[in-house]
Regions:
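Cyclophilin-like peptidyl-prolyl cis-trans isomerases
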Residues: 1-157
């Protein structure tokens, strides 16, 4: 984070292979660097990945949604720290925006492509979830990802 806070997550290519591949590709391009968490709802989730910072931006393409309601086996529950792809009402509309669960939201299970989990820095998710927001759930003080990196442990993506 811009303030020096660090979150680390593990990704699950066995659960959502295309989603993980897309996320890693965007990370490697520096797509998420200097991007804010533009939507923050305490007790629910924090959302980022829009380079415009307003909730409508993306990479210029969308990917197939890897979740049960869209014909994919994905049993990763939306519990605290889980990463999942944000999308519109259309199941195959995710691109770059993702959210990190602040609290459990079982109503999202099977309806959104969960693909990873925060393994270090869950307190940072909590900290971001507790910042004051405006009427659009946008933090009054930017919560910016300074640099997002990935370690694939020798696996090519």
């Amino acid at each position: 984070m811009e303030n020096g806070d660090v979150m680390k997550a593990e990704l699950y290519p066995d659960i959502a292979p295309n989603t993980v591949n897309n996320f890693i590709s965007l990370v490697k391009k520096g797509f998420y660097d200097e991007v804010i968490f533009h939507r923050v709802i305490k007790g629910f989730m924090i959302q980022g990945g829009d380079p415009q910072g307003i909730g409508i931006g993306g990479p210029g393409y969308s990917i197939k949604g890897e979740f049960a309601q869209n014909g994919f086996k994905n049993d990763l529950a939306h519990t605290p720290g889980v990463l999942s792809m944000a999308r519109s009402m259309m199941p195959d509309s995710a691109g770059s925006q993702f959210f990190i669960m602040h609290k459990a939201a079982p109503h999202l299970d099977g309806a959104y492509a969960a693909f990873g989990k925060v393994i270090e820095g869950l307190d940072i998710v909590d900290k971001i979830a507790n910042v004051p927001t405006d009427y659009n759930d946008k933090p009054r003080v930017e919560q910016k990802m300074k640099t997002v990196t990935v370690d694939t442990f020798g696996v090519d993506y």
